[in-house]
Amino acid sequence: MQDISNHTPMIQQYLKIKSQYQDILLFYRMGDFYELFFDDAKKAAELLDITLTARGKSNGESIPMAGVPYHAAEAYIAKIVKKGLSIAICEQTGDPNTSKGPVERQVTRIITPATVSEEAFLDNNQDSILVSIFEKNNKYYLAYTSYTQGKIYLVKTLTSLNELKNTVLKLSPQEIITNSHELAQQNPFKKPIKALEEWYYSNFEAKKYINDSLDTNIANNILNLYKNDQLTTIGSILSYLTNILKDTPRHITDISYEQEQDTLNIDINSRINLELDNNSKSSLLSIIGKCKTSLGSRLLKRYFSNPTRNLNILATRHSIINSLGENQHFLKIQDVLSYISDIERIISRVALGTVKPKDLVALRDSLEQLPILKKLLSEKNTPEITNINNRIHQLDELVTLLDKAIIENPPTTIRDGGVIKEGFDKELDELKSIKDNSYDFLIKFEELQKQKTGISTLKVGYNRVHGYYIELSKQHADKIPTEYVRRQTLKASERYITEELKNFEDKVLSSKEKALAREKLIYDTLLKKVIEYYKQIQETAASIAEIDVLANFAERAIKLKLSQPKFNNLAKLELKEVRHLAIEHNIDEPFIPNDTLLSKDTNTLQIITGPNMGGKSTYMRQVAQLIFLAYIGSFVPASYADICDIDTIYTRIGASDDISSGRSTFMVEMTETAYILNNASAKSLVIMDEIGRGTSTFDGLALAKACAEKFAQIGAFTLFATHYFELTELAKQYPNVCNIHFEAKEYKDNIYFMHKAVTGAAKKSYGIQVAKLAGISQDVLESAKQNLYNLEKKQQLTESTQVQAQFQLEPTTQNPLQQKLDAIDINTITPLEALNILFELKKR
């Protein structure tokens, strides 16, 4: 640490504390403000748009300073946290009246993007995720926690940076910690990331924190179940949280392992291409996600992150959706759910010490809805719904306690009291009555003093600096009784106090202090009582979230005309009248549905041709979205859906230059294609849209053909849209390849898209007609038509030569054997003639 002896004592104290928190902003409490100094002040002034000033000089230089009022700090902190930065809160812990030198101060809390619990800092509909990455021997061990959910999840060991990136971005964390300084420096995730000191990833320390933080039985189970490197990753989260909280994270009550074999995998590019869960109004989540609670919205996002292939889980969800859909029973349930607050986060705030009085009122009001909800669920007496209902705990005792203890509209904090309801505590009521009755005493006392002095303008008042006083104008100085003691002199008046008024003041102020202390004690005791229900409330919250999502699915099924999918083990995907929900939602005319059939026995690869705007991309996307919906347990936009086991969805749709990495559009396209080719299997669904456009015609055709052939050989279910009509010939070479196209009709120089998938290859691309629709001027269109005519004429003359130049490695001169073969008409010769020709050629 640098020499700080030339600084003032207060700045010396600040610098000592700041040296322990160099990478985060230090909010340093001074009276009614949190102050920031030096570089922190400059950064905060820019981030928060607050004034940058200077506080005198220290070590001969002006000290940059910026500050925010402590009572408004929450709003400023929220801005900083949402920008991905962290803050250390440094409070005055010493008594200013007894301190010699600067008041003692300590950092009481660290606030980071993923470790906040206050409502102002959080997105109600999104989990606050902290990811830990332990890199060792070119492997990545990953664990994450949804902070306010109170759980840690362990992910399978990852063996490549690309796999790690996809896993992390799927989680969309607010914060990442790691042992790898190189990974933190590269930051391929573009998320807040920090490399921690080595001890955070010590296996010895990890086991210690697991034992200290978790229930004994859970800790023992974890230590026996997982390997050392996995334990190290789990322990890193617990040690980090302990350091952040300055306390043991007791709210973490569960550790679980995510089984990848039960998950439908979708890489981050495919998620973006399919518009699954981005923030746009056209995303699938925005159309499907109409949950009534924050609990349900967050759970639905988890479903979107981890679609399950577990058929038992899917069958359970479908059964509940059907039950809730009967007579639209979900409407009654959703009405009750709309009154339930975020009890999961409220109980976490209780455990973390950040709960506010209004949270307790919201908790009480939410728990009051549970008997109604349980009754509605019991009306659907199915095993699946009963199972959920049994995990919703009716906490009548807690409701009664909170109802008796907390006033209806409490203040924001307990700091100034006024939270506990009258009648809850006798001692508190007595202390408050002294203050409440003070007004009557002061009225009587003032009237008595007026009579005693004969001064009708005499006033009795109070201010926070001088306390209670008797105020008289200076013109009445000759009438002042001898027992009046001067307290304050003003320009036109004097203020006095008497022994009686001083005794009353001491009694009132003492009662206020005692009442506030008593109220805080009652409040703390109340929170300890509430936390006894932690596990029951967490389990109740999880069950409410589940029923909210499924009631939402039931409502969406009816509103959007969705049907229940079936699952088969026949390697067959049969879909009828499939629709694209976002497009259907955003157009005025009726959406034209399409059928899709993919089967190992008939076709696994569809070559899709047709004009731009004809419907090719929509067709492919809607199939992928349907599969995705089926695997989150929703009903699907089709009249019929029979789905086989799909373990991964890959897409190669659209592209743009990756300028920051120096990669062209074509390079991006090829990189993504290579990833798909290297990982696709017979259980994959692959969407390929117009591959090979970013290079020369024949290079593009060659690559597109080779990729299509590879997918045919793999047997992956592949929808392959292309403008290379030559690829339609693959259907003659591979029995598992078929052609479909999207029709268009021409009428009086206009084009009309049918948006209907038809068997066979397209015969025309209609590019010029599409250009006309786009608004290209008539003179350009006429020129294009002439150019097209010339090009087609030229191609007819040179096509065979060009194709040979592109694909043929041998000399173009045919040998006699080749000439003989070319002369044979295989459509007219008999089998016997063919054998004779073969025998003759063999003799040569």
From Swiss-Prot:
- Per the record, GO CC terms? cytosol
Q: One Pfam family for this entry, by name?
A: MutS_I
Q: What domain of life does the native source organism fall in?
A: Bacteria
The UniProt keywords, alphabetically, are: ATP-binding, DNA damage, DNA repair, DNA-binding, Nucleotide-binding
Q: Does the keyword DNA damage apply?
A: yes
Any one GO MF annotation of this record: ATP-dependent DNA damage sensor activity
An individual GO BP term: mismatch repair
> Which residues make up the binding site for ATP?
610-617
Keyword ATP-binding recorded: yes
- Functional summary from the UniProt entry: This protein is involved in the repair of mismatches in DNA. It is possible that it carries out the mismatch recognition step. This protein has a weak ATPase activity.
Protein family (similarity comment): Belongs to the DNA mismatch repair MutS family.
Which protein is depicted? DNA mismatch repair protein MutS
User: What species does this protein belong to?
Assistant: Francisella tularensis subsp. tularensis (strain WY96-3418)
